[in-house]
Structure formats: structure tokens, C-alpha cells
Amino acid sequence: MSRSLRHGALAATAIAFSIVSLSACAAGNNAETLKVRPDNAATSVGSIKVQNANVITQAEAEAEGPAAVTATLFNDGTEAEVLESITLPGTDVRVTIRPAKGKGPVEIPAGGRVILGGKGNASAVIDEGREATQDGNVQQIVFKLSRTGDVALGANVVPATGYYKDFGPSA
């Protein structure tokens, strides 16, 4: 094989390699491979997105007491929404919703978010947590909003230990 053929073959190989490797850049940051569903409870209805929904029970399995509903609610719309209620279908338990400060409704501002659970955030407390659900289950939850209506999803039920300790019913 002559020297010029070797150089030509080497150049062709280098070009082919760069085309293959650089073509991945054309996929953009919204490639299908990036559409991985998270392993936490999340859904969207209209302009409302609910992410990372959990029901956090007492730390000890035998302990009685309240449980907390935690989630982040995003409003991508142009008008504010009010979180009117949270229900757990199939149960008769009551969920008490309180804003982060003061009294009144929990409002999700247009283009904003509300975090339920944790210090300094709005809260949603299930008065009789153990009657509603058990650790390890998936509990159906319905968030009722003033404009969007019902937003339903299944939330993981976890005890207030580890990462969830600061978001649980006593937080």
C-alpha cells in the first residue's frame, strides 16, 4: 500500500469518526433519551404540575398520629390557582391545608410554585395518618384546584425517617 493511500485512508477514518461522534450534538438537549420518567410521583394536568408527592407517616411503625402530604405544585399558567382541598379516595380522613404564613388559602401564583411540607412551607396534614394508609403502599391523592379541578396521582407512603424526617408530620 502506497504512502498516499495510507494517508487517505487515515484521513477518511478520522472524518468518519468525527462525523459519528459529533452527530450526537445535533440531537439537542431534548433528545428522546432524556425523557426518563422519575421514580417519584409526578403528573400534570393543564398548566399544573405536581412533583415528588409523598405521604409521610410517623417515624415508628406502631406510632399513632398525623401524617403529612408533601409535594411541589407548579403553575405554568397565567393566572393564580388556589389549592382548595386534598383528598385520599377510598378513605374518610380529613386533610388540613395551611399556608406557609398567616391564614387563608394556599395560592399557587401564576408562573410560580408552592411546596407542601417542610419548615417554612405550606402544610397538608392528614389528621389520622395510620387510618389512611400504611408505609410502603402507594396512596391515591387528589389535589383540587380552583381553575384546573382535580389532579390525581399515586404517592409513595414513607415513614418520617432519613431524608423524610424534616418533611414529616412533626416538621
Language model features by range: what are they?
Residues 1-12:
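Bacterial N-terminal signal peptides that target proteins for export
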Residues 20-24:
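C-terminal motif of bacterial Sec signal peptides marking the signal peptidase cleavage site
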Residues 30-144, 154-171:
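Compact, glycine-rich, soluble single-domain proteins
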Residues 26-28:
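Acidic, negatively charged sequence tracts
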Residues 15-19:
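Alpha-helical transmembrane segments
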Residues 148-151:
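Short acidic/polar inter-strand loop motif in beta-rich domains
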